[in-house]
Amino acid sequence: MKQIGLISPNFSEDTLVDVYKILPEGIHVEGRNLDVARYIDSEFHRVEQTFADVVRELTRQPLDFLMITGELFLSYKGPGSDRQILASVSEITSVPASTVLTAVVQACRALNMRRVVMASPFPEDQDLRLSRFLAHDEIEVVAHRCLGYNNSKVIWELSPETGYELVSSLLSENPGVDGVYMPCNKWRITSVIERMEKDFGKPVVTNTQAWVLEALRGMGMAQPIPGFGRLLQ
């Protein structure tokens, strides 16, 4: 049995439902919650103070890989902050580790997505910061549209169709982009990835897809996984 450690701003067992649909059998995810109340900088700063302790506690268990999710937490200090976080993790543990933003950048590059549209459930200011972060890694967010929510509980209740409709609107106005990026693992959009790619003819990168693939690669277990978009095929 392989084990992935997962640190997330708003971890819950419910969040793993889509993860286990994607992961091959024989892999367990052990999660820890940073407990971000709202997606604002003061909250990100607060949980940053306890982040190292969470890493230490989680990595006392036998882990094959450690993944840190939460695009907004990872990007709130600006471009390159994912690398800073990974550097701090490497001082605590020898467990191979990555972040969801590192994984998203790798996923976009793998699909030749240099010019993208971003559909998100987040507030406008957080989308703009995330766009600047991606630009630092040479991924241009040509246009973005957001739903404006700063609370994971509200986002969790959103229908997958909210993602589909947002992407449809963005691509109708920006048909020349290379693909679509959709952040947030609390936005339950995994079930509509294939339909969006089929209907709109563009590859789609989401939070969950990207970090799962990154973790599988890190454990030497990458394999084609049908049903969840081109990235995993």
Regions found by a protein language model. Give the residues of each.
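N-terminal glycine-rich anion-binding loop in soluble enzyme alpha/beta folds
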Residues: 1-56, 124-128, 132-159
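Short, well-structured alpha-helical segments in soluble
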Residues: 48-61, 165-177
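Glycine/small-residue-rich loop that forms an oxyanion/phosphate-binding "nest" at active or ligand-binding sites
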Residues: 55-102
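Periplasmic-binding protein-like
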Residues: 64-69, 117-118, 177-184
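Conserved beta-alpha
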Residues: 89-152, 232-233
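Short, flexible loop segments at boundaries between secondary-structure elements
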Residues: 149-152, 200, 204-224
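Hydrophobic alpha-helical
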Residues: 164-196, 206, 211-212
